[in-house]
Amino acid sequence: PARSLMSGWRDLAQQCHGYGSRFFIQLTPGLGRVGPPTCLVQQTKFPVSASFNRNFYIPELPCLRLSDRKLTRIIKNAGQAAADAKACLIDGVYLHGHEGYLLEQMTNRAFNRRKLGKYADWQRFGLDMVREIRRRVGHNYPIMYRIDLSLALNETYGGRMDQVASLKKFKNGRSVAETLDYMENLVKAGVDLFDVDIGCYDNWWLPHPPAGMPAGCFLPVSRIVKEHFAQKGIRSNAGVEVPVVAVGKLGYPDVCERALRGGDCD
């Protein structure tokens, strides 16, 4: 990036540090099937995804399958972005692997239905990206990963999963057990802490809980992860318990205090 752009980020980091604060920068390899299909009009290019998935906004519009070569380039770019963030004095990087964006599309069998190539292994893209970032930033630089424990599409739609054309291919999403296994491997690859949510674009209301849902509605989700790591004795790369961040209507100090004291999250 241009020197002027880098200096802007460095100035922002120093301003935050002046108040005793720390901040992470969120990195994403892209939107994939949930990106607006303006690329077709503006660049005469089809949108892309892990497999031949339908575009979220225009289901009749197919997304082209990214080649292994292009995915490897994306991983290298993520490593460079993380190295740039460290050079700008930003305190850590935060990978967005939730809500059905491209990182989730590559690491969830609902969207990644590849049969050939190294990224037919649905865990590999995410693990390779974390390893590349860790290689570029060194051992003492935090990597945070935002993930959903489940897409919860089958729970949301039930029998409609077989009836709605735009949902049919997404029935075999990552199970909770598979997600926990993936998270274990992410820790081994270099992730230091997690932000755990639930849902995706195709059940948009769920990861953005409406007024009718109670405060702290997803604390059981973060507790599942906390208990799993504790039971298996999984420690972060810093040798401490893996911190787990909770989400879901936590704008209430009393609810947050109980959650922290009760061990639901960190």
Segments from the language model and where they lie:
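Flavin-dependent oxidoreductase catalytic cores
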Residues: P1-D266
